[in-house]
Amino acid sequence: WATSSGIISDGSKGEEIKVTRLGRRLFGEHGHDPYMEDPATSWIVHWHLCGRPGRTTWFWAFSHLPTLSFDRDTLVQGLLGLASDRGWPRVAPTTVKRDVECFLRTYSSRWRSAASLSHEEELESPLVELGLIKPVGKKDGFRMVRGPKTTLGDGVFAFALLDFWGQYSRANTLSLEAIAHEPGSPGRVFLLDEDDLVERLSGIEDITDGALTWSKTAGLKQVIRVRSVSAKQAEQMVEFDFPVRSKREAA
């Protein structure tokens, strides 16, 4: 979980396993949220889980699932179909089912009766509080909740936008359509519609200190990159969403 959330490096390139810069910023001795009590931290973790194709179930569910309402079998069959289309060897249905169970427990408070859960499984995921997936109707029915996200701060949104942009394109402009609909985009991962995005993007210049600007010239809605922003600078933008600790440290 820590490596998938970008909190520690996995040592896959021969490097030692260690806490990342983002991990220190959030959970270090002087971190913004060492006990993971602020929703901003949960949004950052969610972004790292679902904004990258490496976590297949998480990425596919938010970026490729064709409907907001679904059941467990819909996810399982969709992922098995993906594995077949990509020619991935040895993808067992039981493995996919376990992955889907883990995914649903990450975001939904209703899963199975308490009697059937282990002690570890009884602990509710902090991402449930984001309200992204709600149980509906029948036992295995769920719905992704698209719309405004009041607990998603502008700092985390700006960080996610820059992170997505860095993976998606080297161009100095990024269209609203891409931000809203491309796989791994803020619109997909945060379940924001275009109106929600426009409202947030209208203030992107202030959050990024002029590095990005929002433009609607000649009906073309896009973000313009005025100057480059490093990965470290992008991470620093999440600090906008931790005002209490920031003010205390400043004092």
State where each predicted segment sits:
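Donor-sugar nucleotide-binding helix/loop cap in glycosyltransferases
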Residues: 1-251
